[in-house]
């Protein structure tokens, strides 16, 4: 029962997070929030119903049991990708038991160590309440959902409950050449109050090299996406949080992503800042890391910086990105350490919208030129020509 009551409380927390009035007001159904909220409510009810039903397996209702099982799987898609057995293995996950695995972790566990072929874990729609670890010994794994608004992995650890921010992620990826498509990663721990200690609640930690995320969602409040280390590519993703919600020391390109601040709504005219999109962890000039955001949109609630200098050589750029007035006029923060002004690299180029006004930006912010930008805006920034195979995506 413990698991079930946990899953119900997680589900309620998710619905609270996703159906928060401010989110609906700011981001209508175009962002799939209603769909997520509805489908996850539905999956929660299914989960509860299925569990309740489970108690009757010992009664003499075998025919209806079978009938119910068949009806659950009737809708199961028959068009799982064709098997190209030379190069790809397919594993199938469905929480209702309609294929080989009912949890994502059990499918990951079934992949052989150091497999040279691509292992596609096809995950049917639904909410999977579990922590998932993809170890270093398992490269070449793809998690393929059915849409970030209908397939998600969720858990609710915080830094306090999991012995630190580095271990509280719902999903931890250490294997290289990891790919995720059309799936959400969620940490549904309650949104922290300002000043809460140990409230960091990470949705995913990406610590393997050469990883790509396409059409994915990342949901949490504080420290949502731990872009820890390695070269990573994000395209058409939806990233939501409030404080330092994209953080780490990876070298990553974010293209065509929607970035949504969930920071508290401030009273009109308030100059307070209550969040930051990025906290990049580059700590020396010798580290070839940094975040590049190209053709993204930034909106949401509260008043946030584009980045704050978590480490002295923090490096982040925004190019051709649309920003609402959720971005504070100064744009960036040096972690209240003026000695970092000379070493951080924060730049903007060709951005638009009320939040992109450069006239009041902090003095250390660089107005980039076309030559500088050319090296930062496409997949060559992350050496994509060496590893990023669009056929895998």
UniProtKB/Swiss-Prot annotation:
**Class of the enzyme per the UniProt entry, highest EC level:** hydrolase
Question: Where would one find coiled-coil regions in this protein?
Answer: none
Catalytic activity as recorded in UniProt: [(1->4)-alpha-D-galacturonosyl methyl ester](n) + n H2O = [(1->4)-alpha-D-galacturonosyl](n) + n methanol + n H(+)
UniProt keyword Hydrolase, yes or no: yes
Instruction: Tell me which UniProt keywords the record has, alphabetically.
Output: Aspartyl esterase, Cell wall, Cell wall biogenesis/degradation, Glycoprotein, Hydrolase, Secreted, Signal
Q: What would be one Pfam family of this protein?
A: Pectinesterase
Q: Where is this site: Transition state stabilizer?
A: 222
Q: Which residues are glycosylated?
A: 100, 113, 140, 156, 163, 182, 295, 350, 369, 378
A Gene Ontology BP annotation from the UniProt entry: cell wall modification
Similarity comment text for this entry:
Belongs to the pectinesterase family.
Q: What is this protein called?
A: Probable pectinesterase 8
């Amino acid at each position: 029962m413990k698991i079930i009551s946990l899953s119900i409380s997680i589900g309620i927390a998710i619905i609270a997070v996703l159906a928060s009035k401010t989110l609906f007001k700011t981001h209508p159904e175009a962002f799939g929030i209603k769909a997520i909220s509805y489908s996850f409510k539905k999956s929660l009810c299914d989960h509860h119903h299925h569990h309740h039903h489970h108690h009757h397996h010992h009664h003499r209702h075998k025919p209806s049991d079978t009938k119910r099982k068949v009806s659950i799987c009737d809708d199961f898609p028959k068009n799982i990708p064709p098997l190209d057995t030379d190069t790809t293995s397919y594993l199938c996950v469905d929480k209702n038991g309609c294929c080989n695995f009912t949890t994502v972790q059990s499918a990951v566990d079934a992949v052989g160590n150091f497999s040279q072929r691509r292992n596609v874990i096809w995950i049917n729609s639904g909410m999977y309440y579990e922590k998932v670890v993809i170890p270093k010994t398992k490269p070449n794994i793809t998690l393929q959902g059915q849409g970030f608004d209908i397939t998600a992995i969720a858990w609710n650890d915080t830094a306090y409950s999991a012995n630190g921010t580095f271990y509280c992620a719902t999903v931890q990826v250490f294997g290289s050449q990891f790919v995720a498509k059309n799936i959400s990663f969620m940490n549904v721990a309650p949104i922290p109050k300002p000043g809460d200690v140990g409230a960091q609640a990470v949705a995913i930690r990406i610590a393997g090299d050469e990883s790509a995320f396409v059409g994915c969602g990342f949901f949490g409040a504080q420290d949502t996406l731990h872009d820890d280390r390695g070269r990573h590519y994000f395209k058409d993703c939806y990233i939501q949080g409030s404080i330092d919600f994209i953080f780490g020391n990876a070298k990553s390109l974010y293209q065509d992503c929607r970035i949504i601040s969930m920071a508290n709504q401030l009273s009109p005219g308030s100059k307070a800042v209550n969040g930051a999109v990025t906290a990049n962890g580059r700590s020396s000039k010798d580290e070839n890391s940094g975040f590049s955001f190209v053709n993204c949109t930034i909106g949401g609630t509260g008043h946030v910086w584009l980045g704050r200098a978590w480490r002295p050589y923090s490096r982040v750029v925004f190019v051709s990105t649309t920003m609402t007035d959720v971005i504070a006029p100064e744009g960036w923060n040096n972690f209240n350490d003026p000695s970092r002004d000379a070493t951080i690299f924060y730049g903007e180029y060709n951005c638009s919208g009320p939040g992109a006004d450069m006239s009041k930006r902090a003095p250390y912010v660089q107005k980039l030129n076309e030559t500088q930008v050319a090296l930062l805006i496409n997949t060559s920034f992350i050496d994509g020509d060496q590893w990023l195979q669009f056929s895998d995506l």
